[in-house]
Structure formats: C-alpha cells, structure tokens
C-alpha cells in the first residue's frame, strides 16, 4: 500500500501546527506544507508589540529548521497554489507543477482589507498582517513622529500603545462609537479607552474619514465632523479579506470564508480547512462564526489533523484570546457579548476579573493581570455554570 500524501496550503500558525500534530499522532505518510511568504512559519502576536519595540528582537519562528527535517515535513516557502482540482485530488502550483493529495488542508488565512482612499496617498501608509509588514513599520515608527491609526480594534490599540512607548504622538480614528467593539464588553472598552487617554493617545470615535490628502511630507485627513488631523504616518487596520477564492473556484462552499463543520471538513470530503480563512457553525445558534485568534488557529489545526487521519478530535474548549497594552495583560474567554457583567477586584489598580452572565449562567470572563486565575476560568467556561446570586 502506497504512502498517503497530505498537502497543507498556507504555512502560518494553523498550517504549521497541523503538520506538527500529524506527526505527533504518528501519521507516517508524506506531508507537504506550502507557504506563499518567504519565511518559515512564525508567531504573529509579537509583531504589534515586542518586535516593534525592540530593534534587536528576532522573529519568533514556530519551529526550528531542524524540526521540519527531523519530522520529514516538506516545507516549501515562497510558493503558491493557483488551482485545486478536487475530482483529481490534485493541486496546481503557480509555476505549473502539479501535486497529488489524499487529504488537503487549506490554511491560507487572510490579508489586510484595503482602504483605497488612504492607499492612493502613496508612501508612509502601512498595514500590519505579516512579518514583512512589521519590518517596514519598525523602520517607520520613531520618536516624535505623528502617527494616525485608523481602526480601534485589538491591533490598532496594540499599535497605539507600542508607538507611544517608542515616543510617537498617536491619534486613533474609529468609525464605531467604541473601541474593540467586536470582542470586548463595555466595561473593558471604557477601561482601555481611559488607559490610552491617560497615556496621551487622542481618539476620534464615531468618526469617518471623508477626504485624504498629501501636503508636502504631511498626511492630512478630513473627518466627517469637519475636523482635520495631520500625521507623518498612517497605519490602518479595518478588518481582513479572507483568502477563500481558491476554495470557491474549486467549488467548495464559501460565505466570506470557507465553510467547515465541527471536524474542520469542507463540502468536499477530502478537503479540510482551519484558521482565519474558516467559518464554522455555532452549535447552539447555528450561525456561521469566524474566530480570528491565535488559539483558534491552533485548536482548529489540531482538530483538522485528527479528522484527516480518521481520529476522534479533541474536545474544543471555550474561545480564548489575549492582548497586551501598556504592560497590562488582558485575557478573554467565552462570550464577550454576555447580557450582564460583574467586576471582582479593582479596575483602577489594573487587577480585576470581569464575569459575564446570561440568566445567571457564567458565559464569559475577562482577566486583567490575572493570568493564574484565567487557567481556572478557561476550565469553568468549558462547562458553563450557574452563578450564585
């Protein structure tokens, strides 16, 4: 019986972790890991923080070069797949080469959503999604630079804190009337907004950019309020575009991402997907959900690897992620849209836990500088419990 070949398209967090999991689970066939970037798989969370702050900070690779050799993982960086042919169990590379697979895993992730109004300004306009992006930003963010950050999500706020720590003057422009609106409860939004403002970050909330101009070396944004903001650099983070076109062209079910089931299987039985590129149905509501987090990429990679081998997948825990801003570690687990939130501890001292409940059932929690407590909270949220009145 010939060896099976498993191909993984996308050499990021999910792709590399899936390859590692396959070997951990004793898969003895061929593994081919194909990545478009000219870098071995690396950790992305540090790109908006330590990597920018410390010029000596090296990229943090997921595994050493020896790891891929020792585990016989055929890592092919700087290569792309241009077509999937499900009926032939074959992928076509951009250079015209073809590779046959028994199982295929798609982990292409996402790219930064473009903002043409800003892109047309030319130089000194940045996004942050990749190591190459971070290397460019590292050269640009300097002391006394006026930095305009468009987008008040997690990455925008981390960049605001990092830029301030480097001595820059920072302004954040956000279209919504709050920050981190998609992933933080109101108590946490207000707390973080106050911390940033105390450090000198200026905010324009509930505000749109209606015009963007370049005047000499200055970048000028006109807001819908009529106000004008001027900067030397613009960094924008307004969401992501998910790399699902390859899957859609192959006839897989997509909906602004590749639709997968609880086993990370797509509409094609021998094709699986994991990470940011995916949409998965929530067990309780049936709604399609995407979780763009480091933890979710690892979790789905593990589930997909087990499913590809025909093994029972591990039980998923409650969704968890974290952010570090101003030296404050904030970890979130479970449902951040809970109906009610309760505070234990003192937010003013930057040490507290927020509990989110629905009908007196604990459904979410936020730990602020309480990493040890978060370990217990993650276990609790794996099995929601009634909170005593």
Positions of PLM-derived features:
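Rossmann-like dinucleotide-binding cores of NAD(P)H-dependent redox enzymes
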Residues: 155-211, 293, 316-325
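Short hydrophobic core segments
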Residues: 9, 99-109, 150, 229-239, ...
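A conserved beta-strand/loop element that lines the FAD pocket in flavoprotein oxidoreductases
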Residues: 68-85, 197-209
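Glycine-rich dinucleotide-binding loop and its adjacent helix/turn
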Residues: 108-166
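FAD-site-proximal beta/loop scaffold in flavoenzymes
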Residues: 121-144, 220-222, 227-303
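Mid-to-C-terminal Rossmann-like scaffold of FAD/NAD(P)H-dependent oxidoreductases
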Residues: 2-5, 11, 24, 277-373
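Beta1-alpha1 glycine-rich phosphate/pyrophosphate-binding loop at the start
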Residues: 2-74, 162-183
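Conserved beta-strand-loop-beta-strand element in the redox core of flavoprotein oxidoreductases
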Residues: 85-99, 213-228
